[in-house]
């Protein structure tokens, strides 16, 4: 089973940016953790990151053309306003789980709404990097049940 993990803007600053919210592990440590846990689950996991909306959309399109079974996406701030990412996710019809390291519903009001989550089978928010592992388990079970 092939899973694409897409991280959006500013996630490359993990371990630098607002450690009290996002944790002390740097981006590469989080990616290594995701890949290691994915391997344990018997998944082929490929991770991508971009601060550019169009590149994120290209990753989503590539997931379709490269025959990925599922997508895990942390759209970062694009969560709250990117209709283009929503459209890309709807367009490829690949089971997707949206992940957020922090609980977006406990933060500033503008972070409470996700325009991208309705294009996903579910959303996991507030469990730090473990949210990606939860998402991999959820995707694996969802795909197997089809």
UniProtKB/Swiss-Prot annotation:
Active site: 22 (proton acceptor), 100 (proton donor)
Pfam (any one): DHquinase_II
InterPro entries membership: DHquinase_II, DHquinase_II_CS, DHquinase_II_sf
EC number assigned by the record: 4.2.1.10
SUPFAM superfamilies: Type II 3-dehydroquinate dehydratase (SSF52304)
HAMAP family assigned to the protein according to its UniProt record, in alphabetical order: AroQ
Physiological role: Catalyzes a trans-dehydration via an enolate intermediate.
PANTHER family the record matches: CATABOLIC 3-DEHYDROQUINASE
Designated name of the protein: 3-dehydroquinate dehydratase
Native source organism of the sequence: Clostridium perfringens (strain 13 / Type A)
